[in-house]
Amino acid sequence: MHCAYFERGTCRSCGWLADPYADQLQRKMARCQSALTGLGGVWLPIVPSAETAFRNKAKMVVCGDASSPCLGILDADDDGIDLSNCPLYPTAITEAFEPLKQMIRRLGIPPYDVKKRQGELKYLLITVSEDDDSLMVRLVLRSDIWIERLRADLSTLTADLPHLAVLSVNIQPVHQAILEGEQEVILTDRETLTVHLNGLPFHLRPKSFFQTNTRVAEQLYATARSWVAEVAPVHMWDLFCGVGGFALHCADVIPGQVTGIEISAEAIASAQQSALELGLKNVSFHALGANEFIDQAVSLPQMPALVVVNPPRRGLGVGLCAFLDESVVQTVIYSSCNPESLARDLVMMPGFELVKAQVFDLFPHTAHSEVLAMLVRVR
């Protein structure tokens, strides 16, 4: 992939970009295998990505001033670097940058100055649905004083940006490296952005977590579904389920109950909306932390034979690993964005062995990757 920002040295977010893509894949495979050395298992071929225009989400720091805004990143001196032509983004996102800059200029919204600790607009977050190029745009502001002016400008912005489906404001008042605050105000009639994966609808709300590489995510979920079908359990849990990616994909191969658990109430609302639209009677979603759920699960009349887990980078942790290891669960399908924490968790579950694993390149040109692993009980 050719990137003028990388060649000039102004942006090094894609740390592996100097390496040919085939070499990147080999390095990722070797890194993941090395992290899980001695744990057994068969490694399936790595699933590659498109090299450009694969990201469905842009997180842009807003810099400069209201008359000349800059969308991109901060350098080491907290000065802005405009990345409006970043090749990671599809056309629908890159074409949205100029209308959004025009809106900032039109309303005179001052970008937040990190060094001076003053200003209002901190981030622009843009998500695209590859279904129809519709967009969800979030403005992260220091205060709510611009909300009514943004609402009054909505018809103008929509005329300039006809693919806009959802516009929201997030209030993040503190001077800290925190992306978003608690308060979210949606300014459009629509509250969700619809994205289809493998024909299944997902309704994204502004705070919903969603994999940033749509096409590779489809392959991740399809592979997990095929592995679940191989095991053919009666019931299944999906822990850290987000908007229901694994649960919804697996529902048609589970004759019993599929239960999704996720701490984010907003993500659970999205998952429930998808299940209702699909007419799924055997799927339920609950807004609970995974550890809170397992505290309640010990009293349930039946445990599933299979559990899917997709924890954050830190992994499952001691408590959840111990619960799974001591339970009657026979198979764990573990989706991990951190092979080191995956390896730590496997060591803490000696009752299971790694049967197979596959790397999915959700994050090209970086050291990051997603590993899907099947663990089967041996004692």
UniProtKB/Swiss-Prot annotation:
Domain of life: Bacteria
Gene Ontology MF terms: 4 iron, 4 sulfur cluster binding; iron ion binding; rRNA (uridine-C5-)-methyltransferase activity
Family: Belongs to the class I-like SAM-binding methyltransferase superfamily. RNA M5U methyltransferase family. RlmC subfamily.
Gene this protein is translated from: rlmC
Protein name from the UniProt record: 23S rRNA (uracil(747)-C(5))-methyltransferase RlmC
The species this protein was found in: Halothiobacillus neapolitanus (strain ATCC 23641 / c2)
Record keywords: 4Fe-4S, Iron, Iron-sulfur, Metal-binding, Methyltransferase, rRNA processing, S-adenosyl-L-methionine, Transferase
Role summary: Catalyzes the formation of 5-methyl-uridine at position 747 (m5U747) in 23S rRNA.
Highest classification ranks of the organism: Bacteria, Pseudomonadati, Pseudomonadota, Gammaproteobacteria, Chromatiales
Residues annotated for S-adenosyl-L-methionine binding in this entry: Q211, F240, E262, N310
